[in-house]
């Protein structure tokens, strides 16, 4: 049995060092909950403490689960991880690379060669109604070529925006939101059902994750949480902001 007080102290130190507003962590074992840690608050007024039942936004944890879905499909012979991305999206291409060079695997491993890009931020800015005004939001709305609300718009941007790739697919690791957006739609095609439905049936339900949901708009999550849900905390220009309007970015 591990010393929970040492883990409490370690996690508390991390939260304080990073000035995190609220954190929840847990260790689950075969017999259920073995350890729980809650720190800070879930609201901007710092009046509502985080507890074991507080819902947090899934954010980019969805990438890990998307990769797991792809691996499940690969194990079942329903998805070839070495298949070119262009097999699923014929319009997909990377500047200066053979059309078939980028594969499902390179998307999943962030090694397709796609550099950091703006489409995710444009999608947030153009589709998240009710977000508090900020310099960032105004700049994203000013520069967005469209609402970035479909996967086709992302693929077209990658193909025609004129950037340089970071290297041939498989050579360079660079975290890519756009790559995972495309991967999620490949999982849709291979599974024959929407990613959210496949993830629910093959990951959440078998693990008893009854309070986990992919919700593009947060309404269902708020209902599921009974109001025990975090606000959205962000840092812009060194200043922390809090917003009850969660990000909406349809193709991501």
Q: Which residue ranges define each predicted feature?
A:
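Short, conserved catalytic-motif segment at the N-terminal edge
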Residues: 2-58, 78, 156-167, 218
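Catalytic tyrosine of NAD(P)H-dependent dehydrogenase/reductases that use a Tyr as the general acid/base
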Residues: 56-59, 173-175
